[in-house]
Amino acid sequence: MPAVALGVSVGWRSLSLWLLALLQLCSADLDVLSPGSGSDKFKVEGRAVVPGVRPQDWVNTARVLVDGEEHVGFLRTDGSFVVHDVPSGSYVVEVISPAHRFEPVRVDITSKGKMRARYVNHIKTSEVVRLPYPLQMKSSGPPSYFIKRETWGWTDFLMNPMVMMMVLPLLIFVLLPKVVNTSDPEMRREMEQSMNMLNTNPELPDVSEFMTRLFTSKSSSKSSGSGKAGKSVGKRR
């Protein structure tokens, strides 16, 4: 019996030792995977500037976002910022302020801690425009939360489709006889045919009659004017 008890105690001790060793290994793995430990964590540094405005007037309401809200930083009273515990990778750094707009910057961090800053180009993603590091982020103006209401102008009235449909035919009727040689009967006949082709509604007046009256009235006025001039010349003689 004492030998059996001694063997059982030795077995329990060895089992407990194995369990302790296993727990130590698991805790070591958790320490390596934990976000706050390890030497592969870096910091993103920079400065935000608003031209003509003191940093004390706006830094209290601003935040620095790295990769969305994955890492959040705050600005000091001089406009500088440091975001700690950022692993290696490629991140978009933004300064968010309700009163000022800042362009985002992409920061690439290598596994050895080398930093590279460049413009964020959503159209040409392969184009790389280097920026200095630590970051120097300058405000581009106030954010545009609202769209300016459009004002009414004369161009809006003139470019209205209904107005153009009313004005253009009138201009054609008035200016076309002055440009085209109306004394030519063939030209007049072609114009009447083309206008009749456009007039598809039978309830509307005949365009050819209108054109004939217009041209004949002009030609008769010209002939009467020339006749009167000839009579006046004859009387003078």
UniProtKB/Swiss-Prot annotation:
Cellular component GO terms held in the UniProt record: EMC complex; endoplasmic reticulum membrane; membrane
Ranges of biased composition (kind: Low complexity): 217-237
Subcellular localization: Endoplasmic reticulum membrane
Taxonomic superkingdom: Eukaryota
Membrane topology: Single-pass type I membrane protein
Entry's Gene Ontology BP terms: protein insertion into ER membrane by stop-transfer membrane-anchor sequence; tail-anchored membrane protein insertion into ER membrane
Xref: InterPro entries: EMC7 (IPR039163), EMC7_beta_sandwich (IPR019008)
Regions of this protein lying in the Lumenal compartment: 29-156
Keywords (A to Z) from UniProt: Endoplasmic reticulum, Membrane, Signal, Transmembrane, Transmembrane helix
Renumbered residue ranges of the record's region Disordered: 216-237
Protein name, as recorded: Endoplasmic reticulum membrane protein complex subunit 7
Organism annotation: Xenopus tropicalis (Western clawed frog)
